[in-house]
Amino acid sequence: MGPAGSLLGSGQMQITLWGSLAAVAIFFVITFLIFLCSSCDREKKPRQHSGDHENLMNVPSDKEMFSRSVTSLATDAPASSEQNGALTNGDILSEDSTLTCMQHYEEVQTSASDLLDSQDSTGKPKCHQSRELPRIPPESAVDTMLTARSVDGDQGLGMEGPYEVLKDSSSQENMVEDCLYETVKEIKEVAAAAHLEKGHSGKAKSTSASKELPGPQTEGKAEFAEYASVDRNKKCRQSVNVESILGNSCDPEEEAPPPVPVKLLDENENLQEKEGGEAEESATDTTSETNKRFSSLSYKSREEDPTLTEEEISAMYSSVNKPGQLVNKSGQSLTVPESTYTSIQGDPQRSPSSCNDLYATVKDFEKTPNSTLPPAGRPSEEPEPDYEAIQTLNREEEKATLGTNGHHGLVPKENDYESISDLQQGRDITRL
């Protein structure tokens, strides 16, 4: 029993060892498979996301969709997300959906005339649309009335389409501006028509005619008739006529400009002092008349005055009348005494010792204190003693020069810049 028990014990030990090894191996295999599966899942998920991202990038944005022209036939039509529903993260566009989008945009890419034909008379599209076109909200009661009539079935003004509404509103604003300017014209016309009965009657007729409207228009636009009653053509014609009438009526009332005075150029106008007998006065009168005639003729031609002679015409251009010589009509020269012009008195005679006023000599300095004293015989009530002192200075210098000339002869004029010897000689002369 001993060896048999030992064999059983050794067999159990081997079985447990092999079982534990097999369990460990199976555990490692299972963990390895799990790792592989997880790696496969990680690789598959980015590939799926990248495919969705590429599909989303291929779809054009809303900006590209609106920037593409509807009438261009050469561009490829993008897939519309609004027509086919919103795109989700996992959806992939199939070929059937792209074909339907292509067909839809091929139908849309038509000419402008086909688009206009697709709308009925009320402005509503014939084909069914998934979304409605944007409409401008009514800003006034006039717009609400127009929209209400279009819904009821009446065809309103400018309701052919959504874009025509914009045109109608802009034209209506222009009409309002025209009304503002034309009211100013009407005020001017009323002020002018108070003086002109004809213009007033014509204005009344034009305004009454402009306010008349056809039956359906007056019924539909009774509340805002002030905008519809403006007839710009009639108003323009009326304003032009009134302005022409006012211009014709105001022309005779305007005063004519004053005539330009003709100035007769006479060289002998300033000859006021006349010396001589009656013969000289008559001679000057005749010469002044001839000069006036010549000066007045200088503005005329032979066409204006056919009585002109050749001498007078030549005198206009070639003769120069000097103040000392006057010409008669016959051509004789008359001498006028020159005493009429006052001659300028010459400078008082200077002393021989003073050559220049800028540089004073020794003689001048020595004589100024003695000469500035007023003489005894001169009256003391003279108003300007300074000027009189200068005159007495000149007189005393002349007397001194005459005395020195009588005794010592003429004294030579001194230079502006004197030497020492000349200065000493000058002192000796002044002492004598």
Swiss-Prot record:
Residues 110-137, 197-230, 244-432 are annotated as: Disordered. Changing Y227F: No effect on interaction with FYN or CSK. Residues 220-230 have a biased composition (Basic and acidic residues). Residues 1-16 are extracellular. GO terms for molecular function: SH2 domain binding; signaling adaptor activity. Changing Y341F: No effect on interaction with FYN or CSK. Coiled coil: none annotated. Pfam families: PAG. It comes from Homo sapiens. Residues 430-432 are annotated as: Interaction with NHERF1. Palmitoylated. Interacts with FYN. When phosphorylated, interacts with CSK. Interacts with NHERF1/EBP50. In resting T-cells, part of a PAG1-NHERF1-MSN complex which is disrupted upon TCR activation. Interacts with LYN on plasma membrane lipid rafts. Identified in a complex with LYN and STAT3. Changing Y359F: No effect on interaction with FYN or CSK. GO terms for biological process: adaptive immune response; intracellular signal transduction; negative regulation of T cell activation; regulation of T cell activation; signal transduction. Changing Y105F: No effect on interaction with FYN or CSK. Keywords: Adaptive immunity, Cell membrane, Immunity, Lipoprotein, Membrane, Palmitate, Phosphoprotein, Signal-anchor, Transmembrane, Transmembrane helix. It comes from the Eukaryota. Negatively regulates TCR (T-cell antigen receptor)-mediated signaling in T-cells and FCER1 (high affinity immunoglobulin epsilon receptor)-mediated signaling in mast cells. Promotes CSK activation and recruitment to lipid rafts, which results in LCK inhibition. Inhibits immunological synapse formation by preventing dynamic arrangement of lipid raft proteins. May be involved in cell adhesion signaling. Ubiquitously expressed. Present in germinal center B-cells, plasma cells, T-cells, monocytes and platelets (at protein level). Its main location: membrane. Signal peptide: none annotated. This is Phosphoprotein associated with glycosphingolipid-enriched microdomains 1. One of its GO terms (cellular component) is plasma membrane. It is a single-pass type III membrane protein.
